[in-house]
Amino acid sequence: SAIYVSTIAPGIVAVEAERPPPIVVNDWLARELRVEAGDPITLEYYVWEDPGRLVTRTSEFRIAGVVPIDAGDRDLAPVYPGISDAPTLDGWDPPFPIDLGRVRPADEAYWEAYRTTPKAFIPVQIGQQLWRSRYGSLTSIRIPVAAGERSDDLPRRYTERLRAEM
């Protein structure tokens, strides 16, 4: 997930010009890959290209920190029919090609316990560079609720502030 990294890893500041850019991984992924802070890591991902071609790309990162799995949130990933609602990884029905034969028992166990909770977090600016499309550079905007605030009042307050700045 592309996020303001300091929200899940306080003390880690992402500098946009830093090369390779930082990535924060959860402790499950760190154990699986046997990595720690300071190690290099290559991220492989898909990018939609016009006209609807799915292309595999890779990017290099430096592990800036390891956080507990609880630092993540399964709601960071948008709901995606055919994926989010699948009871198992083997049950995925994505609209893009994927080799489900690569799914290991450990991956199924992760899905069962944590669903769409991200395993890695990159700075939002880097995510926008990597995954920007003709539809935009963000899939969602998350607005945290401060202690003592009511979440049901958040849409009204956000709309008021947005209108005031237009």
Question: What residue spans do the PLM features occupy?
Answer:
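Alpha-helical transmembrane segments of bacterial inner-membrane membrane proteins
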Residues: 1-166
